[in-house]
């Protein structure tokens, strides 16, 4: 499971600066979800093959109401959700009573915590450690967040005990390559043992709990509750038609007979973790509310993670034909960026259309993990280039030479060529659509990556040998004499 790190501390100790520096290591910054969180900011980052979720909390003022109200509003939830807490203090301001109050609270929570002495510019790190020793939380880690000093040591302390990403090859290992002429196949993995992992996500009150209970209904063969490795997510293995599945339920434990949707406490962290751990994401929307910005934010999470996607429009029953037509138009207009995903109109409460989700889950998963040989992908590339060539750049045609598979779930197709940095986005979309159509991919995003060919002689000065210099002089002399003879004849 992806570890969660929370940044806590007084106002203006540099939490946001550190947050920005850490999340800048990846292009995907989750940012604020207006309306879902109050003063907390969520981001994703990666360090030495380890992905992690970062939470930036608002400052804890430390006044008579600060510890109660502020901590209850934002920092308390962040601490509860976190695997590691980074307690930031200001080395320039020194030890304060508010720091002591925060330290006491962290000790009561029994959370793995590190004191981080920020702003050690022009300050002796050893003096900073001694300054905050009375907190009783071990040696402080000195950093200068604004300049990036000490960040490596900080991340080593926070993340060294967590495993590398499952899909990240360990150092010295190479990714499996499909040999020439080999048939496309599914590569067995953890999902083969536990079944397809399905994360059901969506805004509060759209029917996630109802859908979970409906999918685990009377026709189930095997079902049991098993607490997952996160604080609230529940992993529920079950079978349907001899196929194994595991539901990742972020809505919490509920009684089996209780199928009405309760008002849920939305947790961005639980959703992010469920998406990361899933093979397929079922995204639930409320047909009566249509597409809202929060839906687009959550879809963005799933897209960034590259997970296969199925969209379920819930509460479809009871809507008039005109209302249904309006919703379909809105879906087509606002969800154009996930047009690869199957859309199902369901009623989780009554079970209408729920059974159809399984076929889409199976097809999406198969598309996401199938592998193809290099010869197949290269042939598709050659056909695409033949039908529609890349544009000219500085009077030179962009050359795309061959393609191979770079990863699965999502499929990553690596294309080698020249001037690849100048391939326009429109042509990238053309290639994505071509591969999707020819390979018949459904329900999964696809990523195109380019690699340029290295010129081994680039930067080398062309030095001629003495023999080559003499030969060049003879040729130049011969050309001059020939030119003179031609002029004399005229």
Swiss-Prot record:
Entry binding sites for GTP 2: 202-209, 249-253, 314-317
Compositional bias ranges of the Basic residues kind: 470-490
Binding of GTP 1, residues: 9-16, 56-60, 118-121
Chain positions covered by the region annotation Disordered: 162-189, 453-490
One GO MF term: ribosome binding
Keywords tagged on the record: GTP-binding, Nucleotide-binding, Repeat, Ribosome biogenesis
Compositional bias annotation for Acidic residues: 164-181
Residue span(s) of domain EngA-type G: 3-166, 196-369
Gene3D superfamilies (UniProt xref): 3.30.300.20, P-loop containing nucleotide triphosphate hydrolases (3.40.50.300)
Family annotation (Pfam families): KH_dom-like (PF14714), MMR_HSR1 (PF01926)
GO BP term, example: ribosome biogenesis
KH-like domain ranges (all copies): 370-454
PANTHER family for the chain: GTPASE DER
Family classification: Belongs to the TRAFAC class TrmE-Era-EngA-EngB-Septin-like GTPase superfamily. EngA (Der) GTPase family.
NCBIfam families: GTPase_EngA, small_GTP
Function: GTPase that plays an essential role in the late steps of ribosome biogenesis.
Assembly behavior: Associates with the 50S ribosomal subunit.
Name listed for the protein in its UniProt record: GTPase Der
